[in-house]
Curated annotation (Swiss-Prot):
Gene, per the UniProt record: rpsQ
UniProt xrefs under InterPro entries: NA-bd_OB-fold, Ribosomal_uS17, Ribosomal_uS17_bact/chlr
Alphabetic keyword roster: Ribonucleoprotein, Ribosomal protein, RNA-binding, rRNA-binding
Entries under NCBIfam families matching the protein: PRK05610.1 (NF004123), uS17_bact (TIGR03635)
Pfam families in the record: Ribosomal_S17 (PF00366)
Protein name: Small ribosomal subunit protein uS17
Record SUPFAM superfamilies: Nucleic acid-binding proteins
Organism whose genome encodes this protein: Pelotomaculum thermopropionicum (strain DSM 13744 / JCM 10971 / SI)
C-alpha cells in the first residue's frame, strides 16, 4: 500500500446490481442552500466494481476510489456494511 496517495471513501446504498461485477451505488449528502439556509438532501449515483457479485439491492456499502476500470467506473466496493433482508 506504500506509494499510493490517500484515497477517497464513500458510503451509500446499492440501487442496481443487474450488471456483471458492477453495482450502482447512490450516495446521499446533506448541503445547505446558499440563500435560504435550508438543508437539502442531494443524491449522486456512482458505478462501483464488485468483484464477487456479492452486493444486493438495498445493501449499505463502503467504496474506495480506484483507477479507471471502464468509461464510468472509478470506484470499487471495499466492504458491505449492512445487508438487506432476503424476501
Amino acid at each position: 500500500m506504500e506509494g499510493r496517495g490517500i484515497r477517497k471513501t464513500l458510503t451509500g446504498r446499492v440501487v442496481s446490481n443487474k450488471m456483471d461485477k458492477t453495482v450502482v451505488v447512490a450516495v446521499e449528502t446533506l448541503v445547505r442552500h446558499p440563500l435560504y439556509q435550508r438543508t437539502i438532501r442531494r443524491t449522486k449515483k456512482f458505478k462501483a466494481h464488485d468483484e464477487e457479485n456479492a452486493c444486493r439491492i438495498g445493501d449499505k456499502v463502503k467504496m474506495m476510489e480506484t483507477r479507471p476500470l471502464s468509461k464510468e467506473k472509478r470506484w470499487r466496493v471495499v466492504e458491505i456494511l449492512e445487508r438487506t433482508k432476503q424476501i
